[in-house]
């Protein structure tokens, strides 16, 4: 088992994402451990003690502070530990092109500026109106997701919220219908989420197994019930006239990117 240590002098999310992207190519043969706030030479010493007993490991570093980064690199050379400095080469090239000295400010992208507060507001919005019967948020939403149960509406809303986009989701349930307000808003911000019926059946069956649901809940994953829901969803989406996205075998990140491109959001 390879252990990839994601090391940073900030929260370490960037290093972790890069490390996880690499680890995902090796399935069960690699794991990622995040080590944030390595800000001093003493922190580097503590880090080296932490990993000294690791038989197979490497470091993915996004440390910005030059002396700390160089010290960590030197220690890794001494210990024969592979290290990848992710941001260093990028910053150096950017500095050359811009003919400007970098700020070397750890965590600069997480500063509490307007973008940060917009993201927090969007997250609070998504949680407030998640899968609820309170549709007052429809008019204030940037995105409205409409789809059957288990089409990733909630996680997609939260992902979009992390990008500062206010998203609300409306579940399609034949017995409940949809709010009239849905027909009163701009259909350009409405996205219908569709999915292959066979995949939806499999997803719902796994969910039932996970929570040991029986009796009436079995209908939730039955062929007849899902056919009924698909017919209802098709009718509603046609009536709305909104754009649709097939989420079958599609990662949430991919679906979010499609939505953001349609909205013209970077």
UniProtKB/Swiss-Prot annotation:
It catalyses: N(tele)-phospho-L-histidyl/L-threonyl-[pyruvate, phosphate dikinase] + ADP = N(tele)-phospho-L-histidyl/O-phospho-L-threonyl-[pyruvate, phosphate dikinase] + AMP + H(+); N(tele)-phospho-L-histidyl/O-phospho-L-threonyl-[pyruvate, phosphate dikinase] + phosphate + H(+) = N(tele)-phospho-L-histidyl/L-threonyl-[pyruvate, phosphate dikinase] + diphosphate. Its EC number is 2.7.11.32, 2.7.4.27. ADP binds at residues 147-154. It comes from the Bacteria. InterPro entries: Kinase-pyrophosphorylase (IPR005177), PPDK_reg (IPR026565). NCBIfam families: PRK05339.1. It comes from Clostridium perfringens (strain 13 / Type A). GO terms for molecular function: ADP binding; ATP binding; phosphotransferase activity, phosphate group as acceptor; protein serine/threonine kinase activity. Keywords: Kinase, Nucleotide-binding, Serine/threonine-protein kinase, Transferase. This is Putative pyruvate, phosphate dikinase regulatory protein. Bifunctional serine/threonine kinase and phosphorylase involved in the regulation of the pyruvate, phosphate dikinase (PPDK) by catalyzing its phosphorylation/dephosphorylation.
């Amino acid at each position: 088992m390879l252990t990839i240590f994601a090391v940073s002098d900030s929260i370490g999310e960037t290093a972790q994402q890069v490390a996880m992207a690499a680890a995902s190519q090796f399935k069960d043969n690699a794991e990622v451990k995040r080590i944030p706030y390595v800000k001093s030479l003493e922190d580097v010493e503590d880090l080296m003690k932490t990993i000294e007993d690791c038989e197979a490991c490497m470091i993915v570093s996004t440390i910005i502070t030059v002396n700390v980064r160089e010290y960590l690199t030197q220690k890794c050379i001494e210990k024969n530990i592979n290290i990848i400095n992710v941001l260093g080469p990028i910053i150096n090239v950017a500095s050359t092109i811009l003919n400007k000295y970098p700020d070397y400010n750890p965590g600069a992208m997480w500063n509490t500026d307007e973008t940060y507060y917009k993201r927090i507001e969007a997250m609070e919005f998504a949680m407030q109106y998640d899968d609820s019967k309170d549709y007052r948020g429809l008019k204030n939403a940037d995105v409205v997701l409409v789809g059957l149960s288990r089409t990733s509406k909630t996680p997609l809303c939260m992902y979009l919220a992390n990008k500062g986009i206010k998203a609300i989701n409306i579940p399609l349930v034949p017995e409940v219908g949809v709010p009239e307000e849905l027909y009163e808003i701009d259909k350009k911000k409405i996205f219908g989420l569709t999915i292959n019926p066979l995949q939806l059946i499999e997803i719902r069956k796994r969910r039932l197994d996970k929570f040991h649901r029986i009796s009436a809940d079995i209908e939730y994953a039955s062929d007849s019930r899902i056919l009924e829901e698909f017919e209802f969803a098709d009718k509603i989406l046609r009536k709305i006239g909104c754009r649709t996205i097939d989420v079958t075998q599609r990662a949430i990140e991919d679906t979010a990117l499609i939505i953001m491109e349609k909205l013209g959001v970077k």
